[in-house]
């Protein structure tokens, strides 16, 4: 859903999306620094993403074939790793060359959230 504000289209859930991206960035940045990884990464990378969604009381499907759309979730992660200002995990989100993404329902002990792995693509020629 979008809303028109000051002549510009804006996502109606923009504030929540901004907070979510900030949390994803903070977790990824701190993980990279904790592993002594120099950021921002400036080579080809692959992402492995598992979006863990809350399980409804009566799910229609055994997997979350429901909103939010997987492609939009993946895009939000790319945007989170490469914010428009400040420090970054990736120099550019165009450095993402492979994505393996899944949506699953949360089951104890796994809580809703995001599991994210970023790895460099080996064999890059200079």
Language model regions located:
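Acidic, proline/glycine-enriched N-terminal capping motif
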Residues: 1-126
């Amino acid at each position: 859903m979008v809303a028109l504000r000051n002549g510009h289209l804006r996502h109606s859930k923009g504030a929540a999306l901004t907070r979510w991206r900030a949390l994803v960035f903070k977790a990824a940045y701190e993980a990279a620094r904790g592993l002594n990884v120099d950021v921002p990464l400036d080579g080809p990378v692959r992402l492995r993403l598992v979006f863990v969604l809350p399980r409804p009381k009566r799910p229609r499907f055994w997997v979350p074939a429901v909103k939010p759309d997987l492609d939009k979730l993946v895009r939000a992660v790319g945007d989170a790793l490469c914010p428009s200002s400040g420090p970054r995990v990736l120099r550019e989100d165009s450095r993402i060359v492979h994505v393996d993404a899944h949506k699953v329902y949360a089951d104890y002990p796994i809580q809703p959230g995001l599991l994210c792995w970023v790895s460099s693509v080996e064999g890059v020629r200079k």
